[in-house]
Amino acid sequence: MKKIILIASLFISFITLGQKKQTIDTVYIRTSALCGDCKERIESALNFQKGVKYAELNLETKIATCVYKPSKVSLNELRLSLVRVGYDADDMKADPEAVKLLPKCCQPGGH
């Protein structure tokens, strides 16, 4: 009986030690958003990324808050997801072709 308890204890210990603790980070990305449509596009682009737990854009500050797992997605990948849908992301400029596809109200000078 003692052997069974010892083996079970060792087994549980190995399982517990084998699990990685995943870190979660929060990042704030400055965007070129202009309106509610921009907000929806930016939040969708970020939330679609694997590893993103939560993303929200504050239209007043044009700052996107993103909670994500760095082991699944990098900060650069998050920025690129915004660039690809037509928005600036910090110092990265929006893809000009993607900007052309945005509604007029979402393009620079649209409001």
Regions inferred by a protein language model and the residue ranges of each:
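Helix N-cap motif at beta-to-alpha junctions
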Residues: 69-75
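Bacterial Sec-dependent N-terminal signal peptides
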Residues: 1-24
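N-terminal targeting signals for Sec/Tat export/insertion, comprising classic cleavable signal peptides
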Residues: 26-56
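Short, low-order "capping/linker" segments at domain edges
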Residues: 100-111
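Short amphipathic alpha-helices in soluble, non-transmembrane regions
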Residues: 41-43, 77-85
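A generic structural motif
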Residues: 62-69
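Sec-exported extracytoplasmic/periplasmic mature domains
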Residues: 47, 51, 72, 83-88
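Conserved short beta-strand edge segments in small beta-sheet-based binding/regulatory domains
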Residues: 86-98
